[in-house]
Amino acid sequence: MATTAQYIPRNNSLPSNPLMHPDSDRMHQGTTYREVQKMMHHEYLQGLATNTGHPMSLTHHQWLPTSNTDWTSGTHIGQAEHNKASVQSREDLGNGYHRSHLVHQPTQNSHHGSWAPTTTHHLSPLSPASNGHQSLVYSQTGYTMLSPQPSLHHGLRDPLHDDAGSHDNQMESPQQPFSHHQDHSDEDAPSSDDLEQFAKQFKQRRIKLGFTQADVGLALGTLYGNVFSQTTICRFEALQLSFKNMCKLKPLLNKWLEETDSNTGSPTNLDKIAAQGRKRKKRTSIEVGVKGALENHFLKCPKPSAHEITTLAGTLQLEKEVVRVWFCNRRQKEKRMTPVGVPHPTMEDVYSQAETPPLHHTLQSPVQ
């Protein structure tokens, strides 16, 4: 009773019209929609039967129902189908493929007529083609029969391709100035032959100027703030550093050589250079006459005392340190000249053997 009471007015008077379900209009329109769809499908099959040849040669246009029927004039049905198609198109784009109905798409050339993939289109309700009525075009995305698998629409594919291409161009463009910079640095970098020649010349000029490798390292620290060890300078002269480090150290050493050569003339500059590092004493050259006097004294006394060295230095007008070093070097030379294991004769024995004639031993005959 509660159910039937909803359809009975309160004044208990029956309406003149028969009772109808509230959704009867939509049910009627839905029925009409199904009937029209069946009719369209039937006409499509008749078109296939009348046209001979492959279905690819069909030139029918899309079915655009424009008659003022319940199906075409129903705005709420068109709106529902529009929403349904929009949701479906969004789902198709998200899933990466398109569900399709094979609907013939008219083309400009008859020989290219095919079941081409087309996106869903909706005509505006007030467009001239629809005569003020909303018309639905059931031409959703489909696949071609004789073409390869369709990819994304060019509107979706080309931006990705263009972005990838532009990204590749952006990745390639920074490399061009970098490569030019590398070429420029390679042109400025000296070759291995140049480094070898410079290292040889540097060593010769350093020895000629009287500087040790440690002196050069300390001088570089005083001039440029970078102190280099004696090992680094030695490895540079021996070409044992890496090519990169050789290229970095070459201009510093070259500049040091130029400043040293320019400051060699005046004594004040020599003192300044000596203050930069421990300056090696120059090699003392002894005259021939002085050297002969030292040799005679060495033959008499190979190891003189400190007093004898001082007296000899005053006599020969030499420094005491020079005389002492000369005797040390002379003794080392004598040791190298004497074989190992043979007793070293004294100088007196040598002179006595040279002055006295050799001894002759007489043979005595046996007593008979």
Curated annotation (Swiss-Prot):
This is POU domain, class 3, transcription factor 1. GO terms for cellular component: nucleus. Residues 1-28, 69-88, 100-134, 147-193 are annotated as: Disordered. It comes from the Eukaryota. Residues 187-261 form the POU-specific domain. InterPro entries: HD, Homeobox_CS, Homeodomain-like_sf, Lambda_DNA-bd_dom_sf, POU, POU_dom, POU_domain_TF, TF_POU_3. CDD domains: homeodomain. Belongs to the POU transcription factor family. Class-3 subfamily. Transcription factor that may play important roles in patterning the embryonic brain. Could directly respond to the reception of the sonic hedgehog (shh) signal. Predominantly expressed in the embryonic and adult central nervous system. Residues 279-338 bind DNA. One of its GO terms (biological process) is cell differentiation. It holds the Pfam family Homeodomain. GO terms for molecular function: DNA-binding transcription factor activity, RNA polymerase II-specific; RNA polymerase II cis-regulatory region sequence-specific DNA binding. PROSITE patterns: HOMEOBOX_1, HOMEOBOX_2, POU_1, POU_2, POU_3. Disulfide bonds: none annotated. It comes from Danio rerio (Zebrafish). Its main location: nucleus. It is found in: Nucleus.
